[in-house]
Every structure is written in structure tokens, then in C-alpha cells.
């Protein structure tokens, strides 16, 4: 069993586990920090950014690159549509992925890149809130970028990275960055998602039983338990032991794993989220008292629900209950409405409100009483009429490279009474503000990240008692600003990995489960050979399909001979008809034999150490690896059996 690490972003993981020829992707997070290298996309053309001087490298200048890079406040930005860093696709072809398991909606934003236009034929599994809220995130991203299109896309700068200043010179895999997917791609990728409930068991092609269990981080967030008859692997990503609005973490399901893969720890390990929430409320109140307005860049779901509740109560206690609050997002209406129909995914306190009856989230009450108003954009109908200052505005995108937040920065940036408060830890706030400098409005950094911190993670690992702990290497090194913060488990075997690495998981299976038919079971005659020890011989045909081993009765030809002779064959007669194959497969001989058996349009593909035969007409692929051969047949079962027999004829036997 191997683990592939396809992402260098610890908060947006993407891994692949290979086992018995099966390829399971764990999450498909999208690295969005790359957009910070680009100029913002305003709704209306900005004179400031339009008049920025071109950046010209000190040597090897290419005139065709003029206009792609702009110098702004001593930093170089790309003047083009923002681009994103995808999970690495060179380690393993996305078309070969059989299953994708998604732990939460923040870790699925690369899904359209993986499932669309790649030949992907696998299946995707997630909880209902993960699917629906993930849809909001994806649709919002597409809308934000498409509503402010760029005339052209800059590409030549990627050939000159060595000539560019930091941070562009350190851009990771810049040539692989991609512009945003289309809404059609979003719909196509989400149509492949199958919804699962907590603790529901899923048979993954006979290799694993996969079970999502609550992780306590956000609505519908899951940790995944992959179990077999002999092993238990737990994937812990984006988990929380704090009491907020989601259902609490299910720790019991994660105990005593053979392998525990842990990722998605907090991005703000040195701060307490409750403390930062209090600071946010205080800074908003001070801003309002100074006759200023507060801008809070946010995502369309998640922590923003808690901010609505906490901030409204705080303003009421401060005597500022008449201050209007606006939530602006292309999916604001859907997000607010959907959050109040998710009772089964909420904490007990929130669930109890549903049965009173009451709204689980107070923002439903605020909406009815006009304390909170929502709009798709600042140019939406009715916004200009309702908008008044001072006020509090929640809108995206937290990167400040696109979305309505760009408009508010331009409108409020020159007034020192106004403030911008960052709560999302995904983006370094000083880099976020770089293209807007000089900026008079106050900036506060109040990261609210409820995922596990290092102390909580160390405590959880001790309680779960895994045999082997698998974590990113960065988690074992002291944090730059807090040397005592790292994962330390002296009594545990720890395996670490980095982006781009392939590691072997220490699961050495000695046995596998085999099923037998009821007909064969009736013929078993156990004999006691020692006290409490019995055994029986068994003769049949071993069939392996979808990783499930099953022993079937002997071939029909043997039965026909039995009927015609009117007497039961002896054991020796049966064993004479059984052949035992051995040796290695000659692919060229297989191709010739397939042609003789009537198969045509056969294509041979060599990838690494594996050989693949594509039978185009039969919609079938035969994969030859070191110790196993797989027939992946999209056609009739009889075709698979015929191909199996043909391959067996190419082996030696006795």
C-alpha cells in the first residue's frame, strides 16, 4: 500500500492511496494563494491599476512580455486573469483514479479540474452538506472571475521566472497554474458525486469498506475510516474538538487504527479562535463608534454563520443595534436558506432549536427583521436603496483579488475611520493588501480557525492510539513563531512525507478473505486432526472480481461428464482436469492470441513499469503489472471471462 502526496498546501490536501490495484483519492483541495500574484479584478476599470508602469527585467528582456507584469508599490504583479495551483498530475494520471473521498467543502475546490476533460471515470463520495455548500463555493468562484473578465491571459512571464523578483521567482509549478473552470465544468463534476450519511458503509470494489464519520469542523465535514477484514486506516482531515455549530467529532470510530493519516491542522496555531472572535467584535464596535464602516472578507458559508450571531449580539450589547449588516455573495440567498434545513448535521444545541420550533441559526431571525440583508452583488437591484453607513459588510473574496470586496476597498480605503478585518487564515493579510497600498483604512488580522491545533492534535493522537501515525513532515518541525508547537509522539511510530513524495504504508497483509458458494459449503467434511483443530480439503475454481475472492464449483464440463457417466467422479478424476498456471506473461504473445481469438483494434501503452492493452471495440483495458494483471471491462461479463481464458493460455501450466 502506497500514499502519494499531490499537494504542498497543508490546509488544502490531496492524497492518493493505492491498494490491490485500486486508486483512492483523499480530498482534492485547491491552492488559491497563487492568486495573490495577480492584480485585483475590479467591476469598473481602475485608473490606479491601469496606469501602473510595466515591470521590465534587468536582462533578457522580451518585448512580447510587455504589459504582462506591473510594478505596484515596489512589488511585481501579473496583469491577467488569476490562476490556481492544481494537485500534481504527473505523479498519477487522474483518469486512473477509481474513487474520490471528500472530507469537507473546503477540500473539494479542485474537483472540476480532476473529473472534467481528464478521462476520469471513477466515483466521488461526500456528505450532502459538503456537496451543496461546495457547490456554493465553486459557483461563487466562477461568478466572481467571470463578472470581471480580462481581455487576454498572460503566459510569457512564466518562462522568465529566474529573472523576476520575489515572490514570483519562487512560484511553484507556475507553468501548471490554470485559470478558473467554467460553470459547465462545475455542474459536470458535481453530477458525479454520490451523497453519503454519517456512519454509512460503502463497499469500494471489494477492497475497503469506507465510512464517513463526523469531524466536528464544519457542516457535513467527515473523517474517513477505510477498513478491511484485517486492516483499519483512518484519514483525519479538517477536524475540531471545539463546540461550535457542526455535529461534534466522532472519536470512537477512529480508535486503534493500524494507520492514522492526519492533516489539515490549524493555520493559526498561536492564537485562540475565541479570543480573536472577541477582538473582531471589539474592532467592529470601535469602527462604528468612530463613524466608520467595517469590511469583513469572507467565504459564503462556515465561520461567517458564527460571525453573524456573535457580532449582532455584541453590537446590541454595545447599544449599536441599529447598525445595518450586509452579506454580499452570488450565492448568499442559497447559503443562508440552506443552513437552516440541516438539523441532522448540527450540534445538539442547534438541533434542539429545530424541534421547539426555532431557527437553528439566528441569522434567519435577523433576515426577517431586516437586521441582516443579503445581495448577489453591489450592483444588484435594491442594494443602492438599502445601503447606508456606517455599516458592516460581509463579502468575498478573502484574497481581495476578485469579488465585491475589491469595490469596497476602493470606496473606503482612503478613510482612516473605516476598517477591514480578516478572519480567514488562508491568505497572509499583508500580501492580500499589497496592491491596494497606500491604504488609510485600518487593517486587523483576527484569524478564526477552529481546526485542531498542535496541543489538541497531540492529545487526540494519544487517545486514538494508532499503531502508525502518518503526517506531513512540516508538522514535526517547530513552528517559526512558537518553537514548542509541533507534533510529538515519542511512543508512536511516525512516518512523514512531503509534497511530491510516495511513501509505503506499513501494512503487510498475510491473509485475505475468500468466499465460497453454498453448494461447495455443503460438501465440506471437517476432520479433527488435533484437539480443537479441524480441516477439510476443498476443490473448486477461484474467481477474483472487483477485489473479491470467491471459490466456485468446478467447470460445467466436469458436471457434464458426471451426468453422462451416471457416476460421481473420484477426487483424482477432478484433479486431473485442474491446471495450475505459472510463469510471467509475454504481452506480445497475448496480443497475437487476442488477434487469433477475434479481437481487433488493440493498442499497447507503456507507462512507467506498467503495460496496458486498450481493446477499443470492447471498451476494455488490460493492465499488466509486476505481480498482477487486471481486466477492466466496461462491456459484457462474458468478454471478461473470454479475455481471462486467453491470457491464461499464454501461461505455462502443470
From Swiss-Prot:
It is found in: Nucleus; Cytoplasm, Cytosol. The keyword Cytoplasm applies. GO terms for molecular function: inositol hexakisphosphate binding. Its main location: nucleus. 1D-myo-inositol hexakisphosphate binds at residues 1-2, 18-19, 504, 508-509. It holds the Pfam family IntS9_C. One of its GO terms (cellular component) is integrator complex. InterPro entries: Beta_Casp (IPR022712), Integrator_9su (IPR027074), IntS9-like_C (IPR048660), Metallo-B-lactamas (IPR001279), RibonucZ/Hydroxyglut_hydro (IPR036866). GO terms for biological process: negative regulation of BMP signaling pathway; RNA polymerase II transcription initiation surveillance; snRNA 3'-end processing; snRNA processing. Component of the integrator complex, a multiprotein complex that terminates RNA polymerase II (Pol II) transcription in the promoter-proximal region of genes. The integrator complex provides a quality checkpoint during transcription elongation by driving premature transcription termination of transcripts that are unfavorably configured for transcriptional elongation: the complex terminates transcription by (1) catalyzing dephosphorylation of the C-terminal domain (CTD) of Pol II subunit Polr2A/Rbp1 and Spt5, and (2) degrading the exiting nascent RNA transcript via endonuclease activity. Belongs to the metallo-beta-lactamase superfamily. RNA-metabolizing metallo-beta-lactamase-like family. INTS9 subfamily. This is Integrator complex subunit 9. It comes from Drosophila melanogaster. The gene is IntS9.
Amino acid at each position: 500500500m502506497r500514499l502519494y502526496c499531490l499537494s504542498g498546501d497543508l490546509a488544502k490536501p490531496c492524497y492518493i492511496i493505492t491498494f490491490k490495484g485500486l486508486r483512492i483519492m483523499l480530498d482534492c483541495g485547491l491552492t488559491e494563494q497563487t492568486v495573490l500574484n495577480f492584480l485585483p479584478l475590479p467591476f469598473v476599470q481602475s485608473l490606479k491599476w491601469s496606469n501602473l508602469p510595466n515591470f521590465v527585467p534587468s536582462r533578457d528582456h522580451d518585448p512580447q512580455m510587455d504589459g504582462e507584469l506591473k510594478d505596484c508599490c515596489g512589488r511585481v504583479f501579473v496583469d491577467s486573469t488569476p490562476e490556481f495551483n492544481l494537485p500534481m498530475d504527473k505523479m498519477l494520471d487522474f483518469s486512473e483514479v477509481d474513487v474520490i473521498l471528500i472530507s469537507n467543502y473546503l477540500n473539494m475546490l479542485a474537483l472540476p479540474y480532476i473529473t472534467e476533460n481528464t478521462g476520469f471515470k471513477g466515483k466521488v463520495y461526500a456528505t450532502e452538506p459538503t456537496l451543496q455548500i461546495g457547490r456554493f463555493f465553486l459557483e461563487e468562484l466562477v461568478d466572481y472571475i467571470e463578472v470581471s473578465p480580462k481581455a487576454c491571459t498572460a503566459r510569457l512571464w512564466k518562462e522568465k521566472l529566474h529573472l523576476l523578483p520575489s515572490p514570483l521567482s519562487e512560484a511553484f509549478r507556475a507553468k501548471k497554474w490554470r485559470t478558473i473552470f467554467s460553470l459547465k465544468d462545475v455542474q459536470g463534476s458535481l453530477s458525479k458525486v454520490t451523497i453519503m450519511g454519517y456512519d454509512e458503509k460503502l463497499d469500494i470494489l471489494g477492497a475497503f469498506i469506507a465510512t464517513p464519520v463526523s469531524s466536528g469542523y464544519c457542516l457535513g465535514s467527515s473523517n474517513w475510516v477505510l477498513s478491511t477484514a484485517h486492516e483499519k486506516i483512518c484519514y483525519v482531515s479538517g477536524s475540531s474538538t471545539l463546540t461550535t455549530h457542526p455535529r461534534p467529532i466522532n472519536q470512537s470510530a477512529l480508535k486503534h487504527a493500524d494507520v492514522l493519516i492526519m492533516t489539515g491542522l490549524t493555520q493559526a496555531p498561536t492564537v485562540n479562535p475565541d479570543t480573536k472572535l472577541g477582538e473582531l467584535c471589539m474592532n467592529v464596535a470601535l469602527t462604528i463608534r468612530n463613524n466608520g464602516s467595517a469590511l469583513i472578507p469572507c467565504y459564503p458559508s462556515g465561520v461567517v454563520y458564527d460571525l453573524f450571531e456573535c457580532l449582532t449580539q455584541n453590537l446590541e450589547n454595545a447599544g449599536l443595534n441599529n447598525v445595518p449588516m450586509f452579506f454580499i455573495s452570488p450565492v448568499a440567498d442559497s447559503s443562508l436558506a440552506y443552513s437552516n434545513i440541516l438539523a441532522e448535521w448540527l450540534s445538539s444545541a442547534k438541533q434542539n432549536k429545530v424541534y421547539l420550533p426555532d431557527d437553528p441559526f439566528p441569522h434567519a431571525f435577523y433576515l426577517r427583521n431586516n437586521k441582516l440583508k443579503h445581495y448577489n452583488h453591489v450592483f444588484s437591484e435594491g442594494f443602492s436603496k438599502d445601503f447606508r453607513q456606517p455599516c458592516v459588510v460581509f463579502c468575498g473574496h478573502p484574497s481581495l483579488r476578485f469579488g465585491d470586496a475589491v469595490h469596497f476597498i476602493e470606496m473606503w480605503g482612503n478613510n482612516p475611520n473605516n476598517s477591514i478585518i480578516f478572519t480567514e487564515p488562508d491568505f497572509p493579510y499583508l500580501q492580500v493588501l499589497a496592491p491596494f497600498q497606500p491604504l488609510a483604512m485600518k487593517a486587523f488580522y483576527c484569524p478564526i480557525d477552529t481546526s485542531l491545533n498542535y496541543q489538541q492534535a497531540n492529545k487526540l493522537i494519544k487517545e486514538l492510539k494508532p499503531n502508525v501515525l502518518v503526517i506531513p513532515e512540516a508538522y514535526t518541525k517547530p513552528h517559526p513563531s512558537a518553537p514548542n508547537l509541533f507534533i510529538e509522539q515519542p511512543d508512536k511510530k511516525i512516518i512523514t512525507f512531503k509534497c511530491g513524495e510516495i511513501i509505503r504504508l506499513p501494512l503487510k497483509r498475510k491473509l485475505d478473505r475468500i468466499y465460497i458458494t453454498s453448494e461447495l459449503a455443503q460438501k465440506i467434511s471437517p476432520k479433527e486432526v488435533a484437539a480443537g483443530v479441524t480441516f477439510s480439503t476443498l476443490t473448486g475454481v477461484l474467481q477474483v472480481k472487483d477485489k473479491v475472492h470467491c471459490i466456485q464449483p468446478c467447470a460445467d464440463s466436469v458436471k457434464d461428464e458426471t451426468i453422462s457417466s451416471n457416476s460421481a467422479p473420484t477426487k483424482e478424476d477432478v484433479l486431473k482436469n485442474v491446471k495450475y498456471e505459472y510463469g510471467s506473461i509475454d504481452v506480445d504473445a497475448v496480443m497475437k492470441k487476442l488477434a487469433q481469438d477475434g479481437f481487433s483494434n488493440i493498442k499497447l501503452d507503456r507507462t512507467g513499469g506498467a503495460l496496458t492493452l486498450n481493446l477499443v471495440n470492447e471498451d476494455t483495458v488490460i493492465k499488466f503489472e509486476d505481480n498482477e494483471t487486471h481486466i477492466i471491462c466496461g462491456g459484457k461479463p462474458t468478454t471478461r471471462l473470454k479475455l481471462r481464458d486467453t491470457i491464461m493460455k499464454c501461461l505455462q501450466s502443470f
